[in-house]
Amino acid sequence: MRRFIAWMLVAGALVVTGCSSGPSPHPHFKIGQPYKINGNWYHPEFVTEYEAIGIASWYGSPYHGRLTANGELYDMYALTAAHPTLQLPSVVRVTNLANGRSLVLRVNDRGPFVDDRLIDLSLAAARELGFERQGLARVHVVYLGTARLDEKPIRPGERREYASLSCQLPTPERLVC
């Protein structure tokens, strides 16, 4: 009888853990300390202005559903991006210089850490900007503001804007609108 009860407890525990979901999101503002990856140093900082031209890449299914650097769940079907140094979450405008397509994206992750790439986009963002198949594109990135924690990333086709864009720029001491 004791063995039966023990087996039932083990089976019950397996059923409960088998039904558990992935990581729980806990979004938070993040700047972070300097860090080194693949021999390169990155120095995150709070900015009120940022503009750069460089190479964008995209990342997808291996990271879908995992926690981002600021504690949100990565959704490869949302319009998001990863940047090595901008405060998280941020809002940027990314323009594909080859075709002129432009998107406003939520930056909620760190990366890319390959070669001299400037920004990593979600699969949805790469599709919208027209470089999913090529994998890389030369882009212009402009910082628009700090994103709010209570906003979810926008998906293609949604008709809304980030509320943070109507806010005044926050200070490093107060990262909320």
Question: Could you say what each language-model-derived stretch is?
Answer:
Residues 1-19:
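Sec-dependent bacterial lipoprotein signal peptides
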Residues 19-177:
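Secreted/periplasmic proteins
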